[in-house]
Amino acid sequence: IFINVKCSSPQQCLKPCKKAFGQHAGGKCINGKCKCYP
């Protein structure tokens, strides 16, 4: 699930993804945007 957070590395997506989807969510940075894996 893409969220509206810009990124340049996967680490930048972990906090926003966990905030949006809970502690077990993961995140990746794809084409400059965060993609979360709830």
Curated annotation (Swiss-Prot):
Tissue: Expressed by the venom gland.
MF terms (GO), sorted A to Z: ion channel inhibitor activity; potassium channel regulator activity; toxin activity
Cysteines engaged in disulfide bonds, as pairs: C7-C29, C13-C34, C17-C36
UniProt keyword list: Calcium-activated potassium channel impairing toxin, Disulfide bond, Ion channel impairing toxin, Neurotoxin, Potassium channel impairing toxin, Secreted, Toxin, Voltage-gated potassium channel impairing toxin
Domain of life where this protein originates: Eukaryota
Record keyword NAD present: no
Site-annotated residues for Aromatic residue of the functional dyad: Y37
Subcellular location as annotated: Secreted
Other facts noted in the record for this chain: Negative results: does not block voltage-gated potassium channel Kv1.1/KCNA1.
Domain characteristics, as noted in the entry: Has the structural arrangement of an alpha-helix connected to a beta-sheet by disulfide bonds (CSalpha/beta).
Function: Blocks human voltage-gated potassium channels Kv1.2/KCNA2 (IC(50)=0.3 nM), Kv1.3/KCNA3 (IC(50)=8.3 nM) and Shaker IR (with inactivation domain removed) (IC(50)=12 nM) and blocks intermediate conductance calcium-activated potassium channel KCa3.1/KCNN4 (IC(50)=6.4 nM).
UniProt-recorded name of the protein: Potassium channel toxin alpha-KTx 2.15
